[in-house]
Amino acid sequence: MLDKKARIRTSREYRNVFEKGKRLSGRFLIIYYVENALDNNRFGFITNKKIGMAVIRNRIKRQLRAIVREYQGQVKNKHDIVLVARAGIGKSSFEGMEKDYIAIMKKAGLFARNANKID
């Protein structure tokens, strides 16, 4: 689980990311991101009912949290990042989600330059 300080928690914080941030989309994910005034990154996760039943939505969120945790140290600091799952994500594999996350984060320039080689 992500630390409390590493999570976007209130609707005001989510709204700030959506209104002031930039958006990039991939096959399975849409990422909204904006700089924050903190010394760390914060992440939020959204899965809507188009994805499927609650069991599937919760599984997707757990998998996305695991991906974020794995690459958290390689992301540039001082950003609020919201991951929105797209409708086709329920049929994808964990590896497919991970590749999509890496591709979008690279495109956004959110990985630190000194990050380990990311495939």
Swiss-Prot record:
It catalyses: Endonucleolytic cleavage of RNA, removing 5'-extranucleotides from tRNA precursor. InterPro entries: Ribosomal_Su5_D2-typ_SF, Ribsml_uS5_D2-typ_fold_subgr, RNase_P, RNase_P_CS. Consists of a catalytic RNA component (M1 or rnpB) and a protein subunit. Belongs to the RnpA family. It comes from the Bacteria. One of its GO terms (molecular function) is 3'-tRNA processing endoribonuclease activity. Keywords: Endonuclease, Hydrolase, Nuclease, RNA-binding, tRNA processing. RNaseP catalyzes the removal of the 5'-leader sequence from pre-tRNA to produce the mature 5'-terminus. It can also cleave other RNA substrates such as 4.5S RNA. The protein component plays an auxiliary but essential role in vivo by binding to the 5'-leader sequence and broadening the substrate specificity of the ribozyme. PROSITE patterns: RIBONUCLEASE_P (PS00648). The keyword tRNA processing applies. This is Ribonuclease P protein component. Gene3D superfamilies: 3.30.230.10. GO terms for cellular component: ribonuclease P complex. GO terms for biological process: tRNA 5'-leader removal. SUPFAM superfamilies: Ribosomal protein S5 domain 2-like. The lineage of its organism: Bacteria, Bacillati, Bacillota, Clostridia, Eubacteriales. The keyword Nucleus does not apply. Its EC number is 3.1.26.5. It holds the Pfam family Ribonuclease_P. It is an enzyme of class 3 (hydrolase).
